[in-house]
Amino acid sequence: MKDWSAKQYLKFEDERSRPARDLLAQIPVDKPRKVVDIGCGPGNSTELLVERWPEADVSGFDTSPDMIEKAKVRLPKVDFTIGDVASYEPDAETDVLFSNAVFQWLPDHIKQMKRLLSLLRPGAVLAVQMPDNMGEQTHVGMRDVAKTEAFAAKIGAKGRGPLPPVMEYYNALAGQAARLDIWHTVYNHPLDGVDAIVEWVKATGLRPFLDPLDEQEQADYLKAYKARIAPHYPVAVDGKVLLRFPRIFLVVQKR
């Protein structure tokens, strides 16, 4: 895919940071030596880690140069680098691996979680949050529009698959865990109409669908996409629409 846009991503910074705050609140580590933000984005989640553990060595990495550039401006004292979770290996001092909305992009993410856990010392924590929204109308609509005659040839079969069942995560990780906490949360974000929903997903889920298209085709796709999802997001009494957004959380403390 093309590079991520930090500017587009940060249009809904507070809403995107809330799951990171909720994940952070459940990490059972008081005084970590080293904390790593996997897929740190523009640094909004890293900032939360610095605030909770000001004495720790906090760092972050991301595959996107644009995201890393923005993160360095936001937190100039934090070490940010371009990197990929698939090749990352934590060192012996790492007490917390934190990841907000990254692992869902990896088809083998359970394998990667097990690999990272195997490299952590006992008592260290892997904390992960992933969107679990492939069945939501935002994402069903993406695929439906991509299948239409106007776009099928260029877009093809895009988007990631649904996440595995919770039991699959539990069975895969329990053998390495002294403590394993898994839960779902469904957020209902009040947004300023369907246009705002489109702006939200343009930064993330829509990217694989838009990247193969030229500028005019992108405009046509977005018009068709908006028309496809609009009936599923009725307007509330105050003019808002509610974006339903399920997410799964995992906090694994190494045995």
From Swiss-Prot:
Pfam families: Methyltransf_23. One of its GO terms (cellular component) is cytoplasm. It is found in: Cytoplasm. It comes from the Bacteria. Its main location: cytoplasm. GO terms for molecular function: trans-aconitate 2-methyltransferase activity. One of its GO terms (biological process) is methylation. Belongs to the methyltransferase superfamily. Tam family. This is Trans-aconitate 2-methyltransferase.
